[in-house]
Design a protein with these regions (language model features):
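Short, solvent-exposed loop/beta-turn-alpha elements that line the ligand-binding surface or hinge
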Residues: 21-35, 76-82, 105-106, 110-112, ...
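Short helix-loop capping/hinge motifs at secondary-structure junctions, enriched
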Residues: 66-77, 238-245
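Hinge/lid segment of periplasmic solute-binding proteins
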Residues: 4-59, 125, 205-216, 281-288
Length: 289
């Protein structure tokens, strides 16, 4: 069954999850990034309890059509969105610009939203040199410093309070659809849900185009990116049934099959061979969308 690490861990605590490490050779294991295989190694002893099939990271998705109008009027550029600080400053400019377009005071619009606040906290803290928590021998230790916590606050919650950031729909792509925001950071797989129109009202809508940019990082920091995604978990059974499951998963993650799945779903390939732009371009699959 498909599961994230937290679900797999809960089932593993019941003694129901099979260790798949014995069904793969060292060469087969080397086909995957090490961090993908160790995600389910809960006891840090080389077990493989989550077989990677789909991964994602985060990107910035932009309503480029309406952005171009704003950029032409204010001189804003894509480079302004490359850092967290630049994003916040640009969001402030966008709020002021939209506010000035009407006679109603303080009715500016938000520029930006995030799908996963937790990812921002974890990744941004690491960029700032602080791992929020560590776990050793089953014990968690919180390491977040006051300075880092304040910087995270000032670049996320403060813009929310000021109306520069927003999050009203279930997902930020919903807020793009209604025109509540122009941009959001979310999973690369969410590209398939990016709307082709903004529905301003029941009677007014307009077409938009998508621009994809890197997830902004803190200025001067070492860039850090999240890797996430559900994998396949095999419940304990007979050796023959477990081996059959692994045989299928090996087939599913062969480069040609993994590329086809990744292109069709918007997820990242999970093997080194499939995670290659030349191989993807040579696959013959339609990459225009």
């Amino acid at each position: 069954f498909s599961a994230y690490a937290d679900t797999c861990y809960a089932v593993d605590q019941m003694g129901l999850v099979a260790d798949l490490s014995g069904y793969l050779t060292d060469e087969e294991k080397a086909a995957f990034p090490e961090s993908y295989l160790t995600e389910g190694d809960f006891d840090d002893n080389g077990t493989i309890k989550i077989f990677p099939v789909a991964k994602s990271t985060e990107l910035l998705f932009l309503n480029d059509t309406d952005w171009q109008t704003f950029a032409a009027a204010t001189g804003a550029s894509y480079d302004d969105l490359s850092t967290v600080e630049g994003l916040v400053a640009t969001a402030g400019k966008y709020y002021d610009w939209t506010d000035a377009r009407t006679e109603v005071p303080d009715d500016g619009k938000a520029l930006f939203g995030r799908d996963a606040m937790a990812n921002y906290m974890l990744i941004a803290a690491k960029e700032l040199g602080s791992t929020i928590f560590t776990v050793e021998n089953g014990k968690m230790t919180v390491n977040l410093t006051e300075d880092v916590a304040r910087k995270l606050w000032e670049n996320y919650y403060v813009p929310f309070v000021k109306g520069w950031f927003a999050g009203e729909g279930r997902f930020r792509s919903d807020d793009i659809k209604t025109g509540n925001v122009l941009a959001y950071v979310g999973s690369n797989s969410s590209a398939t849900f990016f709307p082709k129109q903004v529905q301003v009202s029941d009677t007014e809508s307009h077409d938009i185009s998508l621009k994809v940019l890197p997830n902004p990082s803190f200025a001067g920091s070492e860039e850090v990116a999240v890797q996430q995604g559900a994998g396949m978990v095999v419940t304990k059974s007979t050796p023959e049934e477990e081996a059959a499951c692994v045989t299928f998963l090996k087939w599913f993650t062969q480069p040609e099959n993994n590329i086809q799945f990744a292109v069709g779903s918007g997820y990242l390939p999970v093997t080194h061979a499939a995670d290659d732009m030349t191989a993807i371009e040579n696959s013959g699959l339609d990459l225009t969308d």
